[in-house]
Structures are given as C-alpha cells and as structure tokens.
UniProtKB/Swiss-Prot annotation:
Mg(2+) binds at residues 488, 494. GO terms for biological process: mRNA catabolic process; RNA processing. It catalyses: RNA(n+1) + phosphate = RNA(n) + a ribonucleoside 5'-diphosphate. InterPro entries: ExoRNase_PH_dom1, ExoRNase_PH_dom2, ExoRNase_PH_dom2_sf, KH_dom, KH_dom_type_1, KH_dom_type_1_sf, NA-bd_OB-fold, PNPase. Gene3D superfamilies: GHMP Kinase, N-terminal domain, K Homology domain, type 1, Nucleic acid-binding proteins. This is Polyribonucleotide nucleotidyltransferase. Its main location: cytoplasm. CDD domains: KH-I_PNPase (cd02393), RNase_PH_PNPase_1 (cd11363), RNase_PH_PNPase_2 (cd11364), S1_PNPase (cd04472). Belongs to the polyribonucleotide nucleotidyltransferase family. One of its GO terms (cellular component) is cytosol. Residues 555-614 form the KH domain. Its cofactor is Mg(2+).
Length: 714
C-alpha cells in the first residue's frame, strides 16, 4: 500500500531521518522529518495553473505547533489551537525567507507549504528541522524549486562554535544564530548575540554553512529515489520585449531616479510608466505585442537595472549619497512627558516614535510554549501604519511583517537589558513608524534604545542599528550603507546589523542571489560597523546614558525577601491578607515562590506602608523590645494585646500596672492602644507581655523599677 523511502544520517551527534511515501500522499510533496525524538511533517501543494492576471508569486508558509506534540492540552474555553502564536509566525517567516528566492523567475502558481510539529522531545528545537523538512518536500514535489536548502543553528559556548545546541545548552551560549542556504551559498541569517565582534559572527555563519552540507546531500539522496517528474514550466523569454521597452523609458527612468525626494521620485516613475503604456497600448488597438502582465514584469525589471547600473557605474545612489554615507539623523527624547520614556528618531525619510512603559510583575506576558509556560518581562511592539508611506490600507492586528520586525528589534535590545535583580520592572516598548523609506526596523532599534534611557532603564550600553544593501553584477559589487526602500527592493541583499560600540547584538541577512562570498560579507560587516558607530554618536547628542531616576509618572518597585515558610502568612487564607494589604496601602504586590516580594506604586509612602505591614507579618518579635499594641480582648486574668502584625500576647493582670489591679477593665478596654514589653515565652511558647514596666505616655521603659518588675514577671 505504501511506497516509502527513507534517508537517515548522523548530524550534530543526533540522528536525522527524512521519510516520504506514507503520510499525506495527495500533497505534491510530503516529508516526515525526525531529529532526536522531535518530529515534523512538511507538505507542499502548488496549483496546476496560475490565476488569470497574477503578477506576483503567491507563496504561503504555515508553521504550526500542536500541543499534543508535547503531551499538553490547549488552554482556553475551546481547548483547541487557535490563531498562530508569535513563535509560529516567526518560524513561518524563517522558513519562507530562504526558500522564496529559489523558485524559478516567472513561476506564479499559488503555492502553500505547511509544516506541522507532531512530536517534541523538549531537547531539539523544531524550527531547524521544519526548515529541512520543507526543503525536502519542495525538492521532491516537482515544483520548479532550485534547491535544496538546509539550515543550522549555531551557538557560541566557551569560545567554541556549537552545532544545533539543545534547549538546555542555549542559556550558556553567547550566540543564537540560524543560517540557511544552498550547497554553494548562504541565503539567510537570523541571530541574537552578546556583543560579539564581527569576525566571530562571520565565522559562525561560515561554520553553519559548512555544517549543514550533509543534510543537503541527504535531501538530494531522497530526491533521487522519490522525486516526482518536474513540472513542464519554462519561464518566458522577455529579452526582446525588454529591449523595446528600455528604448522608450530609459531616459525618463534615469531622470526619475535622480530625484532625491521619495514621493516626487515615485510620481516621476509613475509618469514614465504611463508614457510607456501609451506607447505600447495605444487607445483603440486590441492586439498589442505584449500583455499587460508582461509589461508590468518588464518595467519592474528595468527599474532595478537602471538603479543598479547607476550605482555600479558612478558610485552615486538614488538620493545622491555615496556608498557609505548615512542619511542625516535627528534624535530627541522626552517628547511625550506624561509617558515613562519617549523618543523621536528620524533618519532621512524614515522616522519612529518609540514609547517605553514600565510595569510590575503583574504586567509580564505569559507565554504558553510547547516547552512549558514562562513569563516575558520585556516586550517590543512594532507598528507600521499605511500613512507612513503615504498610502491608505488595513488597520488592525499586527501582520507577519510587523511581528518579525518587532522581534528583530527585540533581539537587538534584549542582550543590553539589566538583570531582573537589578531592575525588577516589566518593560514594554512600542515603536510607531510615522515615516518609512527604508530600514524602519533599525530606526526602531535606535528609538527604543533612546526611549529606554529616557525612562531610566539602566541598559548596559546604547544600541544602534543599520541596514546594508548590495548591488552585484558579475565580479563588480557595491555595498550600500543605510539603504532606502527602493535600494532594498531593487538590490541583491538586505543585511541588518545592530549592536553597541563594542559588538553585535543582532544580525539579519536576506540574500536574493547566489555568489555572495565570505569576502563580500566581511566588507558589509566592516562597513556596517562604521555606520553603527556614527549613528551611536548622533544618538548621544540627545542622551548618552540612562537617566539616574525614573520618570515622574513611572511606578517605583522595591524588592524584599521573606522566608519561604512565611509566604502563606503574607498571602493569607484565600488571599485574604495580601488583598487587605493592597486595598489599604494602594501598592501592588507580587510574591514569587522563592520568597522574593516586589512592591510597586508611584507613591513612595504606599510602598513603605506595605513593606512595614509585610515585615510585621514575617518578622519575629524580640524579647526585651517594646511594642505598641491594641487590646483585642479582656479577661478576668488579664488582657490580650495584638502587638506584632497578626501576633497576640497576654498581659497578665499582675503586669497591667505597678499597683494591685482588682479588675482588668479598671485599667484597659478593648480597642485601647497600649505600650507593652515582650518579657519572654512560657513553656508552651505563649507570649508574655508587661505593661507596668513601660511608661504608657511615652512608650519608654521605666528604668528604676526594671529589675524588680522583671523578676516579678518571671
């Protein structure tokens, strides 16, 4: 019934298995991949024909984690998986980026890649395995995919590169880098690092590329026995038509791309396109030498050619800069004084307002992952409204691009945040992109760094980011610093680097062509370093280090530690005690399992009141000390006084006053405030108090009678 094929190799000290022919046989390609005991199923389906009028390649990658893979049942009312989590979205993008450039130019059939995590061993992260499985499924599907690709995760532990470190090893690593590519070239890099130098980062990329070669060989081996017949797809030869269109539009496009202002340049390009359309599609003529779709493809191609020719021939870019110049920068902080921290970062025609907000442990984000539930105390959200590029568009929940850009900026900032013990706040940064002409994610990095410093968050060092580009024709190439949006779309590489003056904290690279050598990447990293240091200098004109004090409207958090056996006393039955403390003091209180107590309020008096209350619950009274208390009950033999948090003690009738007392209520009444001295504990551990050795007016001990009365009490 099944015609199965399997390939197994040893990779990074664990078995990697690729199997096809048994599951999802109606898909164009399906591969069950297992690494260690983590298993994923990747499927590929591509439509037989493109939709009429389709002028782009509609590729969708869906990565989905099933909770049963880790032996869990989903939370919530419906008890089933819902909308994609942030991690699922990020992994979908991680897989999409290296495979998208490898589909044959001109292929426009609707294509969907679905990767499902079926089993998670809680050791091997399924993201790299999912990339490998997707590549294998595409390679055997018959779809015009010029792969295969593979990916690898690279760690850096004790000065050594580590291939595919497991989940337990990652906290020790100074690097979390994912690299993907073909056997010849690197196509994609994504990383977070602890201020590592450029040569270490480049070494990690090359180490990863070398390490995944056995996987590519395994995919080829599987394809040799299991691949379907390649689809009969031949890309159109548009060279003759392109030459005709070029003759009409070249001069107009060259002039348009001399205009430095974005909107005016776009208007000139649109005018050139309209003029060419009139030439090739005259009114009233039904039969033309090319279709509208062919014209759109050719015009887009010519736009790229003219920009690229100009850069390589003259060294001048669209906006008149040379290859390494960064656009003018203006940095401002404190622009929204009622917020906890704020910044406006403007670089050329790219601008971001970033606002930092500080919260307590109650504000931490609860994340339910396959590996377990954990809390995240730093959030960075990136918003890209359509007005930022002068357009109308959909508003609402964030899209994949916004989630991806936010995470890239998060990775850049995260290594420079203070430890929770030093700064016990939850931090949320929100970047509102108000203008965009290239590299808005790196503007978010710069703006977030400024806003956090304005908020008084003691980051280790300021962080800046820069986007690099590449134009390559044959042996000639040009590396561009601080690319515009057009240079991103029309170039061969988008290379974002963020870090401090001492090293890189985040790196993201997407390469659209083969042949990017180690030498080119080295040039790009060095050029990026110069740009990054320049940007840090411009940012320092606004603020160079974190403010010494938090903003006026930010909450204050103080931390105290209590014995773990006292946690129950502070919380009380059903939370009664802690609710009372919160209600009466106004402070927010968070108690952790290790006895760490965080008390938060914007009012210092509320914090002190809560601290004093908690201290009174957990502290032990000391023999010989004097306390103020309240009479809670009277009896024939004395009075019970609440004197130390919830603790009560007995003042025997003989200890109420220096003179003989006939009746307890002659001296004290319930609710009366009194001063008492802790004399000790009886054989049953009961508290013994005395009022007569304390001056009830001043609360001071009556020294003259101290020795005699203490003897009497004993």
């Amino acid at each position: 019934m099944f015609n199965t094929h399997k390939v197994e190799i040893e990779w990074g000290g664990r078995p990697l298995t690729l199997e096809t022919g048994k599951i999802a046989r109606q898909a164009d390609g399906a591969v069950l991949a297992t690494y260690g005991e983590t298993a994923v199923l990747a499927t590929v389906v591509s439509a037989k024909e493109p939709k009429p009028g389709q002028d782009f390649f509609p590729l969708t990658v869906n990565y989905q984690e099933k909770t049963y893979a880790a032996g869990k049942i989903p939370g919530g009312y419906f008890k089933r998986e819902g909308r994609p989590s942030e991690n699922e979205t990020l992994v979908s993008r991680l897989i999409d980026r290296p495979i998208r450039p490898l589909f044959v130019d001109g292929y426009k059939n609707d294509t969907q890649v679905v990767i499902t995590v079926l089993q998670h061993d809680l050791e091997n992260n399924p993201d790299i395995l999912s990339m490998v499985a997707a590549s294998a499924a595409l390679t055997i599907s018959g779809v015009p995919f010029m792969g295969p690709i593979s990916g690898a995760r690279v760690g850096y532990i004790d000065g050594e590169y580590v291939l595919n470190p497991n989940i337990d090893e990652m906290p020790e690593s100074k690097l979390d880098l994912v690299v993907a590519g073909t056997s010849e070239a690197v196509l994609m890099v994504e990383s977070e690092a602890q201020e590592l130098p450029e040569d270490v980062m480049l070494g990690a990329v090359m180490f990863g590329h070398k390490s995944f070669q056995p996987v590519i060989d395994a995919i080829i081996k599987l394809a040799e026995v299991a691949a379907k017949e390649p689809r009969d797809f031949q890309p159109e030869d548009l060279s003759e038509l392109e030459a005709k269109v070029l003759a009409v539009v070249e001069n107009d496009l060259r002039e348009a791309y001399k205009i430095t202002e974005k909107q005016a340049r776009y208007a000139a390009v649109d005018a050139a396109k309209a003029k060419a359309k009139e030439h090739f599609f005259p009114e009233g003529v039904e039969e033309t030498e090319m279709s509208a779709e062919q014209f759109a493809t050719i015009f887009k191609h010519l736009q790229a050619k003219i920009v690229r020719w100009n850069i390589l021939d003259t060294g001048n870019r669209i906006d008149g800069r040379d290859l390494s110049t960064v656009r003018p920068i203006v940095s401002e902080v404190g622009i929204l004084p009622r917020t906890h921290g704020s910044a406006l970062f403007t670089r050329g025609e790219t601008q971001a307002i970033v606002v930092a907000t500080l919260g307590t442990g109650e504000d931490e984000q609860m994340i339910d992952a396959l590996t377990g539930t954990y809390k995240e105390s730093f959030m960075l959200h990136y918003n890209f409204p359509p007005y930022s590029v002068g357009e109308t568009g959909r508003m609402g929940s964030p899209g994949r691009r916004e989630i991806g850009h936010g995470k890239l900026a998060w990775r850049a900032i995260h290594p420079m945040l203070p430890a929770a013990e030093q700064f016990p706040y939850t931090i949320r940064a929100v970047s509102e992109i108000t203008e965009s002409n290239g590299s808005s994610s790196m503007a978010t990095v710069c703006g977030t760094s400024l806003a956090l410093m304005d908020a008084g968050v003691p980051i280790v060092r300021p962080v800046a980011g820069i986007a690099m580009g590449l134009i390559k024709e044959g042996e000639r190439f040009a590396v561009l610093s601080d690319i515009l949006g057009d240079e991103d779309h029309l170039g061969d590489m988008d290379f974002k680097v963020a870090g401090t003056e001492f090293g890189i904290t985040s790196l993201q690279m997407d390469i659209k062509i083969d042949g990017i050598t180690e030498e080119i990447m080295k040039v790009a990293l060095e050029q990026a370093k110069g740009g990054r240091v320049h940007i840090l200098g411009e940012m320092a004109k606004a603020i160079s280090s974190s403010r010494a004090e938090l903003g006026e409207f930010a909450p204050r958090i103080e931390v105290m530690n209590i014995p773990t056996d006292k946690i129950r006393d502070v919380i009380g039955s059903g939370g009664k005690v802690i609710r009372e403390i919160v209600e009466k003091t106004g402070a927010k209180i968070n108690i952790e399992d290790d006895g760490t107590v965080k008390i938060a309020s914007s009012n210092g008096k509320e914090i002190e009141a809560a601290k004093k209350w908690i201290h009174s619950i957990v502290a032990e009274p000391e023999v010989g000390e004097i306390y103020e208390g309240t009479v809670v009950k009277t009896a024939d033999f004395g009075a019970f006084v609440n004197f130390f948090g919830p603790r009560d003690g007995l003042v025997h009738i003989s200890q109420l006053a220096a003179d003989r007392v006939a009746k307890t209520t002659d001296v004290v009444k319930e609710g009366q405030k009194v001063w008492v001295k802790l004399m000790g504990f009886d054989e049953r551990g009961k508290v013994r108090l005395s009022m007569k050795v304390v001056d009830q007016e001043t609360g001071k001990e009556i020294v003259a009678e101290k020795k005699k009365e203490e003897v009497d009490a004993e």
